[in-house]
């Protein structure tokens, strides 16, 4: 759907739908040094595993973990069983190419890929935040797991407020960068992608997650039908007056 309306997205390498297909993982990722395994119906960033490289014995995750083949196969199996899905329902495992993320945010994010979440109401960007990975979050840009959320002005992209664990902060806990110095290149393009997500899905209220690839520019990672309330905490104010 995204490709049909010219929205950049990571390439889908493969899909594992059944337990008997788990053993085919290595064949699916052949030719890819780095990739991402994620549940199709996950929430809160649960179940997302970013593999940076692998050899004949181990997989190496973006968070620095060394995983055996058995560990990763079990992770995929758990995904299919619904361990990470909403309501614990049976799920499928999506395998995508990893984003070659831009280094413009290297001072603001610890290891993992930072992303921009655009809340879109009836096709119009209403609130925006950037989520920055930390050591505590394991390199994941997820506020529930300890990432930093920075509320951004929709019109300018300038930082307005920053939080971690629902508390206001000024510096990134690991890099010590001043979060008010954060700037997002291609700001207009981020907002356009968010608006196009409405055209693609028809959802009156959604959250579009967008990352900045070094070579391809802004790319949409996913669209959330229930994006949650964390963005209001990142802004330090509610969304009622914006909808």
Regions found by a protein language model. Name each.
Residues 171-189, 198-203, 212-243:
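C-terminal active-site "lid" helix and adjoining low-complexity regulatory extension at the edge
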Residues 52-56, 120-124, 154-156, 213-216:
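Short acidic-glycine loop/turn motifs at beta-strand connectors
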Residues 150-179, 194:
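Intrinsically disordered, low-complexity Ser/Thr/Pro/Gly-rich regulatory segments
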Residues 48, 136-145, 172-173, 230-235:
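A short, polar/proline- and glycine-enriched secondary-structure boundary/capping micro-motif
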Residues 1-47, 69, 82:
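A conserved helix-loop-beta module that forms one wall/lid of the active-site cleft
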Residues 33, 61-164:
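Phosphate-binding site of ATP-dependent enzymes
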Residues 117, 209-211:
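Short, surface-exposed charged micro-motifs
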Residues 6, 93-103, 189-195:
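Short Pro/Gly-enriched beta-strand edge/turn motifs at strand-loop
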């Amino acid at each position: 759907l995204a490709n049909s309306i010219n929205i950049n997205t990571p390439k889908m390498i493969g899909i594992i739908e059944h337990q008997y297909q788990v053993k085919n993982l290595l064949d699916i990722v052949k030719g890819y040094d780095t990739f991402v395994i994620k549940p199709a119906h996950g929430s809160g960033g649960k179940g997302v595993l970013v593999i940076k490289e692998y050899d004949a014995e181990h997989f190496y995750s973006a968070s620095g973990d060394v995983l055996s083949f058995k560990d990763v196969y079990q992770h995929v199996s758990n995904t299919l069983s619904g361990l990470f899905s909403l309501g614990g329902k049976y799920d499928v495992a999506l395998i995508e190419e990893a984003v070659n993320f831009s280094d413009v945010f290297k001072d603001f994010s610890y290891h993992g890929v930072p992303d921009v979440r655009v809340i879109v109401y009836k096709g119009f960007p209403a609130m925006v935040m950037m989520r920055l990975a930390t050591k505590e979050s394991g390199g994941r840009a997820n506020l529930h797991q300890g990432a930093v959320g920075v509320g951004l002005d929709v019109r300018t992209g300038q930082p307005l407020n920053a939080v971690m664990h629902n508390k206001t902060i000024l510096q990134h806990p690991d890099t010590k960068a001043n979060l008010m110095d954060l700037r997002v290149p291609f700001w207009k393009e981020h907002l356009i992608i968010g608006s196009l997500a409405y055209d693609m899905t028809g959802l009156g209220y959604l959250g579009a997650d967008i990352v900045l690839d070094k070579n391809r520019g802004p790319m949409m990672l996913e669209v959330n039908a229930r994006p949650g309330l964390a963005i209001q905490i990142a802004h330090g104010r509610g969304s009622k007056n914006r909808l």
